[in-house]
């Protein structure tokens, strides 16, 4: 069994904002190494229930072993958290007391060479979080049009050299398919002028991020998962999301603000006719970040941003 050595970020902050209590029902939509899940179970003892989602079967199995001491207080679901409403309905749960989404790729997935998430090692260009899914990064790289490749790399990677990288990919794949991570890295390095390489950022970072997001439909999943999670919250229940790059954080911020907004009528209309009521109260005006102590012991936490809401 793969050992998911994943250090959970912002552990104290997650518990403070989620505020688990005995008897509560909580969803960890991104179970991963089960670090946050264990904290939630301990805080909601003796009878709190945790439903853990992960589309990565390897992660789910490993988490199941780690959480075995909690027995029937844990329910595992192999599914993307975007479908949490449907999945919970299937097991008869209509409302929850809280949910957590810690989005993005896990340290273990990056370190598992054969998964193809990392540009540091040579491996098949895969990047699927759900290994039963059909589309791999290699398929996108070798089949998308130059225009679509450019759009994916620019929008999901926020890469200024997207057009040039897409053009170089097309040229290379006309000679031979791009099948491995390092083959793609070579193309990207050739496309991005050396003078534009950033000191602390590998030139392939943004393109690999973009492809991973596209392969796993991460942004749409986040938006759907957040909205679905809020709908399931009981009054006073809380939702917490941790993101690691600006695209994810922007979605969390926008979604939560929209759900917290009341009347959406134009200002020139003196009386509300839309009937829209706020669903949540935003608990974090600005995103919560890791302190210096955590960053020094877990550098990955440096880019973590936590936002939270409470159902009203």
Swiss-Prot record:
> Keywords on this record?
Cytoplasm, Methyltransferase, rRNA processing, S-adenosyl-L-methionine, Transferase
Its Enzyme Commission number(s) read 2.1.1.199
Tree of life domain: Bacteria
Location(s) in or outside the cell: Cytoplasm
Q: What does this protein do?
A: Specifically methylates the N4 position of cytidine in position 1402 (C1402) of 16S rRNA.
The entry assigns this protein to a family as follows:
Belongs to the methyltransferase superfamily. RsmH family.
Of the GO CC terms on this record, one is:
cytoplasm
Q: Which reaction does it catalyse?
A: cytidine(1402) in 16S rRNA + S-adenosyl-L-methionine = N(4)-methylcytidine(1402) in 16S rRNA + S-adenosyl-L-homocysteine + H(+)
Entry's Gene Ontology molecular function annotations: rRNA (cytosine-N4-)-methyltransferase activity
Q: Which organism is it from?
A: Geotalea daltonii (strain DSM 22248 / JCM 15807 / FRC-32) (Geobacter daltonii)
Gene, per the UniProt record: rsmH
Q: What is this protein called?
A: Ribosomal RNA small subunit methyltransferase H
Alphabetical list of Pfam families matching this protein: Methyltransf_5
Identify the residues that bind S-adenosyl-L-methionine. 34-36, 54, 81, 102, 109
A GO BP term here is: rRNA base methylation
